[in-house]
């Protein structure tokens, strides 16, 4: 295997430590606890050729050092790592959202330097959207982990060509829908760079063409899988509840999010992260308390 190391200047606030802590608690695809101190390490499928790559990221002030190791296209692997960590976003205007919205100012203060992360690609986000249908998050996370243990590569989710061939014995139409996701990924319908180049609403409509992906799943693929910074998750009931709690009864997501542009996704992720920190809704599910 070969290694490629890239230094990338990060524009705007970023904390590797905060982002790593967020990802480690991200229930759908939690980051493993194998990273060394002051680093973030993860293994993933590279969209360009579906090879497997290991990435190790460190921070030196406003510079991210991304070291990728694998047998495939390492330039693409490094670019993808920058995207799934949101290091490719010019966030110098993020502080302006805080000036316009005191709720987001508080969120930024509590999660200093957080940049949304979690899914390595739209393909993995789409697979999660299928696996989590009609299941609790913790149940779906266990199912995903079992698939990786049995069919993955060094901890990475199976590539789409392999997923097409697998008979996972999943309930309902999950197997059919996963194969549709795999076929779409191979056809380029779930390409992260392509989805990022579209307007978010257009990208969501395009993803809706994939069998098995409804409105919530399509938004997840675009906003969290492609890591689009300025989209609006309109099918997130926990976010809606947080809007009511933070902004008051009668206030709507559409109304309050006008002040969040061009970082609506980021603001929504911050509010959801703080809600989980406060309520432990998902964690309580994992411990069988709800």
Residue ranges with predicted function:
Residues 1-290:
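HhH-family (HhH-GPD) DNA N-glycosylase catalytic core used in base-excision repair
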């Amino acid at each position: 295997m070969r290694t490629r190391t890239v230094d990338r200047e990060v524009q705007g606030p970023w904390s590797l430590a905060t982002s790593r802590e967020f990802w480690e608690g991200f229930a759908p695809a939690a980051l493993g606890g194998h990273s060394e101190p002051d680093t973030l390490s993860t293994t993933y499928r590279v969209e360009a050729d579906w090879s497997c790559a290991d990435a190790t990221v460190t921070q030196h002030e406003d510079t991210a050092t991304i070291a990728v190791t694998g047998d495939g296209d390492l330039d693409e692997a490094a670019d993808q790592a920058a995207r799934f960590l949101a290091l490719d976003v010019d966030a110098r205007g993020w502080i302006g959202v805080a000036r316009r919205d005191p709720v987001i100012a508080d969120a930024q203060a509590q999660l200093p330097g957080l940049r949304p992360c979690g899914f390595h690609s739209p393909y993995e986000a789409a697979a999660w959207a299928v696996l989590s249908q009609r299941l609790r998050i913790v149940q779906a996370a266990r199912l995903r982990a079992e698939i990786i243990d049995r069919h993955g590569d060094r901890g990475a989710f199976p590539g789409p060509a392999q997923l097409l061939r697998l008979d996972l014995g999943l309930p309902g139409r999950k197997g059919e829908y996963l194969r549709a996701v795999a076929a779409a990924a191979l056809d380029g319908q779930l390409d992260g760079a392509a989805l990022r180049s579209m307007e978010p609403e257009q990208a969501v409509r395009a993803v809706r063409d994939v069998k098995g992906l409804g409105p919530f799943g399509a938004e997840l693929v675009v906003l969290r899988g492609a890591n689009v910074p300025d989209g609006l998750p309109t099918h997130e009931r926990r976010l809606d509840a947080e809007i009511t709690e933070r902004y008051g009864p009668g206030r709507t997501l559409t109304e309050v999010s006008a002040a969040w542009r061009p970082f609506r996704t980021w603001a929504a992720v911050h509010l959801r992260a703080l809600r989980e920190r406060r309520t432990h809704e998902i964690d309580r599910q994992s411990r069988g308390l709800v």
